[in-house]
A protein has these predicted regions:
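A metal-dependent hydrolase signature that marks the N-terminal structural subdomain at the beginning
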Residues: 1-7, 11
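Interhelical loop and helix-boundary elements at the membrane-water interface
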Residues: 3, 16-58, 76, 80-111, ...
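Transmembrane helix interruption/hinge and helix-loop junction motifs
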Residues: 7, 61-71
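Primarily interfacial, aromatic-capped hydrophobic alpha-helices that serve as membrane anchors
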Residues: 63-67, 113-118
Length: 118
């Protein structure tokens, strides 16, 4: 069961956006925000673990909101890649956030169309 079955697509997107904001700001903390970037970490394992930990928190939010472990796993991978791109200087903060929200919109579409069962 997910929010879609109770309130519709807009409420589902809104819930995804709230979960994203919580995981990207208060739940991330200064340490993960810095250490998930390769240039800030003192050893390779530090940035990989930090980026993965942050992406797992994001994945948990998607799983909780959608009820789909598959979408949660998808978020883990996509969030990891998007934040890697930002950390490597491929794009900035605004593009990073727009890409994350585009993923959430894609999850809503997939759920509305019934492509992923929950």
């Amino acid at each position: 069961m997910n929010i879609l079955s109770h309130s519709g697509p807009f409420a589902l997107f809104f819930a995804f956006a709230i979960a994203h904001a919580l995981a990207d700001f208060p739940l991330q903390g200064d340490y993960l925000a810095r250490m998930k970037c390769r240039s800030q970490a003192s050893m390779p394992s530090e940035w990989i673990i930090s980026l993965t930990a942050h992406s797992l928190v994001q994945a948990g939010g998607v799983w909780i909101v959608s009820g789909s472990a598959l979408l949660g796993a998808t978020e883990l991978c996509l969030h990891w890649l998007i934040d890697l791109g930002k950390g490597e200087g491929k794009f900035g903060y605004v593009t990073d956030q727009l890409l994350h929200l585009a993923c959430k919109l894609a999850y809503v579409i997939v759920l509305v169309l019934g492509i992923v069962a929950v």
